[in-house]
């Protein structure tokens, strides 16, 4: 009996006969030869079947029957295919299979996603099948690499995984963006972020991170928004703002390197410019303040490439502003110290400048915009209470959060990264919907 292997491992079996469980992604050929494009989730590669070889091995009657089975295979039929692995310099993969036998496992009739072009709505309605296509597999392989490296990076840097709840009993920030549900007669909300709970974890464990789904009821229909997405939040006690930025930069560079190392064929499939990714790793990220960014935007707003509206100091950036800023520097760019009025209540003011807060957004170049948001947290109880009172917030909704400042408060901060935005950036794809297996967007909750 031949050894069963995966496609990605065939390089270790050159000259040997192996069996692969796969699906037929495509088929071509005529006369005495048939070409099968095979996939098994690890990679795609080609199998070649020659009619005379089957006749010689099995005799004319059985050999012709088996070859006829191969000729009649339809798209996405599942098979056990046996053959001898050969090197193939013409192939991007570098190897092909000289097919010696085949067994059909599950037939596929009238597969809806054919090689022709299909509209986005059709593909999204058939997302459960679209996932099988070469480019969608590549994006998910990049997502997997990013998740793997996330756990590896934080473990190496002394962080403990901490699981924040998905259901919360209070409306932590903007209640207009919360999904509300009934919790045994009491209103409950799907989490927008695990950050507030993560701060409690940091006071117990020092360095913590969580990774899980979050939900935002934003009625935004853009290429950068999902209503359900995955977030990695990290929180760190006894931390300075510069140390936080250094950690964020090291993390993003580790993610990009991890994708280069773990998913090179996926990047090739997507035709991602890997030299750009290598440059982002090699060069220091740019760091500028919010006010410097506004000055820069105003200075260049009449330039030919300045496709953005005029902003004054105190205004928030839109996507065109973020795109221009990061493209101007050509590397991921931290914009620091935003106005307190447009940021969250818990952010610590810049020393000597209470109108600005110690925070930063990391803007990715090539039009991908914000991928990380982070800040130092206000650790002083009285200052935090004063800020909440100024904003008319109900303190009783935040009793546990305020307790963290009453019992051994310390300087601390953290940041969060939207995994789908990072996947989109690393993969070089245009729309965030392809960065998650089953995207949830405005007007889309199926399949």
Curated annotation (Swiss-Prot):
GO biological-process terms attached to the record: asparaginyl-tRNA aminoacylation
Catalytic activity reported: tRNA(Asn) + L-asparagine + ATP = L-asparaginyl-tRNA(Asn) + AMP + diphosphate + H(+)
Top-level EC class: ligase
Keyword vocabulary terms for this entry: Aminoacyl-tRNA synthetase, ATP-binding, Cytoplasm, Ligase, Nucleotide-binding, Protein biosynthesis
GO cellular component: cytoplasm
Single annotated GO MF: asparagine-tRNA ligase activity
Compartments it resides in: Cytoplasm
Family the entry assigns: Belongs to the class-II aminoacyl-tRNA synthetase family.
Subunit composition and interactions: Homodimer.
Protein known as: Asparagine--tRNA ligase
Protein's organism: Streptococcus pneumoniae serotype 2 (strain D39 / NCTC 7466)
């Amino acid at each position: 009996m031949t050894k069963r292997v995966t496609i990605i491992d065939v390089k270790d079996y050159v000259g040997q006969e192996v069996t692969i469980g796969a699906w037929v992604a495509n088929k071509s050929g005529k006369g005495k030869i048939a070409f099968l494009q095979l996939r098994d989730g690890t990679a795609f590669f080609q199998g070649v079947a020659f009619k005379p070889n089957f006749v010689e091995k099995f005799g004319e009657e059985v050999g012709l029957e088996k070859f006829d089975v191969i000729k009649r295979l339809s798209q996405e039929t599942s098979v056990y295919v046996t053959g001898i692995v050969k090197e193939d310099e013409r192939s991007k993969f570098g190897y092909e299979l000289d097919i010696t036998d085949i067994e059909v496992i599950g037939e596929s009739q009238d597969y809806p996603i054919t090689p022709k072009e299909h509209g986005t709505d059709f593909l999204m309605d058939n997302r459960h099948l679209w996932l099988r296509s070469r480019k969608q597999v590549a994006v998910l392989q990049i997502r997997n690499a990013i998740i793997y490296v996330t756990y590896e990076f934080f473990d190496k840097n002394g962080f403990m995984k901490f699981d924040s709840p998905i259901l919360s009993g209070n409306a932590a920030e903007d209640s207009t963006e919360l999904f509300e549900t009934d919790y045994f007669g009491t209103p409950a909300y799907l989490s927008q972020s695990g950050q507030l709970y993560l701060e409690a974890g940091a006071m117990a464990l020092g360095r913590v991170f969580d990774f899980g789904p979050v939900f935002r009821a934003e009625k935004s229909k853009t290429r950068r928004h999902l209503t359900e997405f995955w977030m990695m939040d990290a929180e760190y006690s006894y931390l300075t703002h510069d140390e936080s930025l250094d950690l964020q930069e090291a993390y993003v560079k580790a993610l990009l390197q991890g994708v280069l190392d773990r998913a090179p064929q996926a990047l090739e499939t997507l035709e991602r410019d890997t030299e750009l990714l290598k440059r982002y790793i090699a060069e220091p990220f740019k760091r500028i303040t919010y006010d410097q960014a506004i000055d820069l935007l105003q200075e260049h707003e009449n330039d030919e490439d300045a496709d953005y509206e005029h902003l004054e100091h105190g205004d928030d950036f839109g996507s065109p502003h973020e795109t221009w800023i990061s493209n101007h520097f050509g590397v991921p760019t931290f914009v620091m110290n935003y106005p307190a009025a447009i940021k969250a209540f818990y952010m610590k003011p810049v020393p000597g400048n209470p109108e600005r807060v110690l925070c930063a957004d990391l803007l990715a170049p090539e039009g991908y915009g914000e991928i990380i948001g982070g800040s130092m947290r206000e650790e002083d109880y009285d200052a935090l209470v004063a800020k909440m009172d100024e904003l008319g917030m109900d303190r009783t909704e935040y009793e546990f959060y305020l307790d963290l400042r009453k019992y051994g408060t310390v300087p601390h901060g953290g940041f969060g990264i939207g995994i789908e935005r990072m996947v989109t950036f690393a993969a070089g794809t245009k729309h965030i919907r392809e960065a998650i297996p089953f995207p949830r967007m405005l007007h889309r909750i199926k399949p």
